[in-house]
């Protein structure tokens, strides 16, 4: 590395928990390669703070879901973005790194780029799945894209956007062979007997929309598979409190709610019922049969449907290029349908063996030592800025 010894300053923004995870991974890699005096600041979550990150605003101020739901938060988000832009232009950091949250970060990245500050974006938006027109915005805003998936650089190259495939940090973190027995011991679950992990989301709006349906599906599954046990991770005390009325309404369920530890809960399971999102990739890396579902408000769903290109929304299916696990979305996500599909995933041993092969191949493809690759790409951008590449 040819960077000078004077203090480097890197501004970063992560807008939600999954971005906090990715940014923390990147910070770890950067701290191994950049001088100890390097300052990292902007907007981040708890994982970033653990790396000494200086967050000037609370990350949850940016965490929204869906077009309609975001309307009430727009004024505050715009205020924060305006203040951040002014701070960047005044302090002129050595680079700005936006981690996911493209609707927020692209505007900041364009302002940085226009001012001669290198702009790096970590996580290519799913332009290959929906809202493909965003690639024009990417070309205007981003100097370098860090891609989680192997097919993304070719798409960006056609638009003239420099990029690096870095793999996914979850593939580095998760072992190729999950320890189901050890996870059950850790959670106090029986070593034998079927266990289903249920993950209805982490936001109030998600729990409100799909939580009752998931709990009704669990009740049906317990009727049809009397020995089954359920495990449900609650990421925060607030989420556990949000789930409690649903738990109280179904006292017959053999349900264990864990404080966080979602990966341990999924590892302990034989099958998973899960809301669409990054957690579905985690489930695939754990080699678990699953059913993917979501419900969003009607108007949000209509907008998403009209701007989509692929017939699937779950990351395991997108990466496989075909339906390898079932998806039940919107009005198709009834308790009966979810119960039937999840029990099929639980009981079908031939399908389980096939999924293990598919997910192992996927795991190996994504296991790239992401923290190192992403950090090295950032260092190259910094070197290029200083004319020493």
Swiss-Prot record:
Uppermost EC category: transferase
Protein keywords: Glycosyltransferase, Lipid A biosynthesis, Lipid biosynthesis, Lipid metabolism, Transferase
Organism: Burkholderia ambifaria (strain MC40-6)
Record family assignment: Belongs to the LpxB family.
EC numbers: 2.4.1.182
A Pfam family recorded for this sequence: LpxB
Any one GO MF annotation of this record: lipid-A-disaccharide synthase activity
GO cellular component: membrane
Lipid biosynthesis recorded as keyword: yes
Keyword Lipid biosynthesis carried by entry: yes
Name the UniProt record assigns to this protein: Lipid-A-disaccharide synthase
């Amino acid at each position: 590395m040819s960077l000078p010894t004077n203090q480097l300053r890197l501004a970063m923004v992560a807008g939600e928990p999954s971005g906090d995870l990715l940014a923390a991974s990147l910070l770890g890699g950067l701290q191994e390669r950049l001088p100890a005096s390097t300052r990292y600041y902007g907007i981040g979550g708890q994982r970033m703070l653990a790396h000494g990150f200086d967050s000037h605003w609370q990350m949850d101020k940016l965490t929204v879901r869906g077009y309609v739901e975001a309307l009430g938060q727009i004024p505050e988000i715009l205020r924060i973005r305006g203040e951040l832009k002014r701070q960047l232009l005044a302090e002129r950091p050595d680079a700005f790194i936006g981690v996911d949250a493209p609707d927020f970060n692209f505007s900041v990245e364009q302002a940085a780029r226009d001012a001669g500050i290198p702009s790096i974006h970590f996580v290519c938006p799913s332009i290959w799945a929906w809202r493909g027109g965003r690639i024009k915005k990417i070309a205007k805003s981003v100097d370098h894209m860090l891609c989680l998936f192997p097919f993304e650089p070719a798409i960006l190259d056609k638009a003239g956007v420099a990029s690096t495939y870095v793999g996914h940090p979850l593939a580095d973190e998760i072992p190729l062979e999950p320890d189901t027995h050890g996870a059950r011991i850790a959670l106090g679950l029986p070593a034998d007997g079927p266990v289903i992990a249920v993950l209805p989301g982490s936001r109030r709006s998600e729990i409100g929309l799909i939580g009752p349906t998931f709990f009704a599906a669990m009740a049906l599954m317990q009727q049809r598979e009397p020995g089954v046990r359920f495990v449900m991770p609650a990421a925060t005390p607030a989420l556990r409190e949000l789930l409690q009325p649903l738990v109280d309404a179904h006292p017959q369920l053999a349900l264990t709610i864990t404080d966080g530890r979602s990966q341990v809960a999924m590892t302990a399971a034989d099958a998973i019922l899960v809301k669409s999102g990054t957690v579905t990739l985690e489930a695939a890396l754990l080699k678990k049969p699953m059913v993917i579902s979501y419900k969003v408000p009607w108007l949000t769903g209509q907008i998403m449907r009209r701007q989509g290109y692929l017939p699937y929304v779950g990351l395991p299916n997108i990466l496989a290029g075909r339906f390898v696990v079932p998806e039940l979305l919107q009005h198709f996500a009834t308790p009966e349908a979810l119960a039937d599909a999840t029990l099929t995933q639980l009981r079908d041993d031939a399908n389980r063996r096939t999924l293990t092969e598919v997910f192992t191949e996927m795991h190996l493809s994504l296991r790239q030592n992401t923290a190192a690759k992403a950090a090295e790409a950032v260092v190259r951008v910094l070197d290029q800025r200083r004319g020493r590449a």
